[in-house]
């Protein structure tokens, strides 16, 4: 499994950042969730690239980009990093799409740099305090299990986490388990995940009522949508039946069609 095939790399903030850019047209930037990588968007990128300039990357702490040298996993650090990455790619503005953690980064970026975001698409995005946490993050925060998570996650644990994160209509494949396990097992990534999970984050959700970027919320029907559709002015929402937290891989056709149809 050559996961680096077709990838490019650039140096930002002391990291060798992996990214893939393909297609022509308006720029669409895809941000993955925690414990994931740009590969989660393979099918979506294939559907968007005939009419869009699709840019996706492994976020700091994940995939082939790996840990931040300064171990700073605050959302504001991700926002600053994303701005530098877009500058390096000569992207002035874009449609910004994020799943889970990627959605959290995306809406915070839109709050900080609204003139750089033409449209915002949030897939099962996070960021509201008090939300129930995924099992992997709970384990990373527990002092008793934290050392185990920091050292390594077995393939079996990865399989259990993936199967627990998807909806009833999706079957986690062996190939998906192998890919995610290969990425999370890269040197430093498990430790980076623990650092991320134990980072105190600033709550900016009160600012969402002032966001003036056109926004589309996508969520699975079994997922807590938090309050984005309520708080963001003139926000559109699409609920996809039978889909869990890993929407880019569970419903790539619906997601790609929603992005292309969002005007």
For each feature predicted by the language model, list its residue ranges.
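Flexible "cap/lid" loop of the alpha/beta hydrolase fold
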Residues: 107, 111, 118-148
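Conserved serine/cysteine hydrolase catalytic core
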Residues: 191-231
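Conserved acidic catalytic loop of the alpha/beta-hydrolase fold
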Residues: 77-94
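Gly/Ala-rich beta-loop-alpha elbow adjacent to hydrolase catalytic centers
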Residues: 98, 102, 106
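Hydrophobic, aromatic-rich cap/lid helix
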Residues: 155, 160, 178-204
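Alpha/beta-hydrolase fold catalytic core
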Residues: 1-28, 49-52, 91-92, 260-263
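Catalytic active-site module of serine/aspartate enzymes centered on a nucleophile-bearing elbow/loop
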Residues: 233-263
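Conserved HGGG/HGGXW glycine-rich cap/lid loop of the alpha/beta-hydrolase fold
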Residues: 15-64
